[in-house]
A protein has these predicted regions:
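Active-site clefts of carbohydrate-active enzymes
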Residues: 234-251, 326-349
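The substrate-binding groove and active-site-proximal loops of carbohydrate-active enzymes
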Residues: 5-14, 67-86, 130-145, 251-261, ...
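Short, acidic/polar
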Residues: 13-28, 141-154, 288-301, 317-322, ...
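Aromatic- and acid-rich polysaccharide-binding/catalytic face
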Residues: 36-44, 239-248, 291-318, 369-371
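Hydrophobic faces of well-ordered beta-strands that scaffold small-molecule active sites
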Residues: 3-9, 32-36, 103-107, 163-165, ...
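Polysaccharide-binding and catalytic clefts of secreted carbohydrate-active enzymes
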Residues: 129-275, 279-299
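Aromatic-lined carbohydrate-binding/catalytic grooves of carbohydrate-active enzymes
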Residues: 31, 35-83
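Substrate-binding cleft of secreted/luminal carbohydrate-active enzymes
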Residues: 308-318, 335-391
Length: 392
């Protein structure tokens, strides 16, 4: 498989610069792939290279291609209201092909505040019965149907090589909250419990799995109240979960039902992509009990690509996931995201060490974040250094 240098991009930045001009620039800078988002979550960005829209502000997120409402079920896509931005995907498909650039879709999964607000029963709900409207729950059949329809709609319209699902599983505690105020320390186990969803869809899934879901919710709520009343010592989350599920069959069953719900999301998208020629990739899987419920071993026969954890911050897990993916019976493309910002000196030893770790993982694609948010000269410099690292 050819190693590719990619860049993550927003359609509004391509549209404002001119899609053809932007892709010409990327080609000349040595990039041969692009990860273009067809939908996005709530975001506020500042783009130094965008002469028309230095600030993009979206409180709840939107869909950024001309989605066809008749293809969807209960949840209808909330389409962005600027025709030029909606036209970016079609232009990107045309000009990417002529420039030898691979077009990939960067698809947001559960972090969809607009869906949670418009369809409150899809929102995450904690053990105390409080909803978070930042994210939707993967146990919702409507959410599963919507995400599959969205990806199929996109890939039926455009020649997308790979669709990467970002966070299609359960959200961690406080993920996506707006200017959150949390003034107490959460140890890993308390944070894990606080992030468990007990919406009606999750309770139904657990009951179907043979679990007394209400009893689990009540026990989690009691334990949370107790742990929140005083400071807790830090713990090894992986070891704690393993010990608890070994001694608590009901909790094990509940966590298993979470994993089944997350897996159903991936299965639904996989089915929807049949016949399109588009490969399916995902992010935030885990080799063990994970907060997202995406157990990698259960997904190897359903995916064609995997975004690995950060090889610096989570080096051991990145190595485990790479090894597991390579043991699969099908070829799985390994991808790494490389953040670029003024906090990183591309010419410094820290950045060089990061590139060395990426090279040793022997990944197939490195995506630099982000086309619009970096200075052009910084993006070009990072791209050149990545190219050198991949060639070693």
């Amino acid at each position: 498989m050819r190693r590719r240098l990619s860049v993550w991009a927003y359609p509004w930045d391509l549209a404002d610069e001119g899609v053809a001009a932007a892709l010409d620039w990327l080609r000349d800078a040595g990039f041969d792939a692009i990860e273009l988002c067809p939908n996005y979550h709530a975001i506020s960005t500042f783009a130094p290279r965008n002469l028309q829209r230095s600030i993009h502000y979206s409180e709840q997120g939107a869909v950024y291609f001309p989605a066809r409402a008749e293809r969807y079920g209960r949840i209808k896509p909330r389409v962005f209201d600027e025709p030029a931005v909606l036209g970016a995907y079609a232009q990107a498909a045309e000009h990417a092909a002529s420039n030898g650039i691979e077009l990939n879709a960067w698809v947001i999964g559960m972090f969809q505040p607009w869906i949670a607000r418009a369809y409150p029963d899809t929102a995450v709900e904690n053990a105390f019965g409080a909803r978070s409207f930042a994210t939707t729950c993967p146990a919702s059949p409507d959410v599963q149907e919507y995400l599959a329809a969205l990806v199929a709609d996109l890939c039926d319209q455009y020649p997308v090589n790979s669709a990467l699902l970002e966070r299609p599983g359960h959200a961690e505690f406080a993920y996506g909250w707006v200017r959150e105020r949390i003034l107490i320390d959460f140890d890993p186990w308390t944070r894990f419990l606080a992030g468990l969803c007990f919406c009606e869809n999750c309770l139904t899934a657990a009951r179907t799995h043979g679990v007394d879901a209400v009893e689990v919710r009540e026990r989690v709520a009691r334990e949370l109240r107790d742990r929140l009343s005083r400071r807790q010592e830090s713990d090894d989350l992986e070891a704690t979960i393993a010990a608890r599920v070994d001694s608590d069959e009901e909790l094990r069953g509940y966590l298993e039902s979470r994993e089944q719900s997350a897996t159903r999301v991936v299965e639904g998208v996989q089915r929807a992509l049949r016949g399109t020629g588009t490969r399916l990739s995902l992010t935030h899987a885990a080799t063990g009990w994970g907060a997202t419920g995406l157990r990698l071993a259960d997904l190897l026969e359903r995916i064609d690509g995997l975004l690995l954890p950060d090889p610096t911050d989570e080096s051991d897990e990145a190595k485990r996931q790479a090894a597991l993916a390579r043991s699969a019976r099908r070829e799985i493309e390994l991808v790494v995201m490389l953040w670029g910002s003024d906090e990183f000196d591309p010419g410094g030893p820290g950045f060089a060490a990061r590139l060395d770790r990426i090279a040793r993982l022997r990944v197939d694609r490195v995506g630099v974040y982000n086309f619009g948010l970096l200075r052009p000269e910084t993006l070009r410099q990072i791209g050149g250094l990545v190219r050198e690292a991949l060639a070693k």
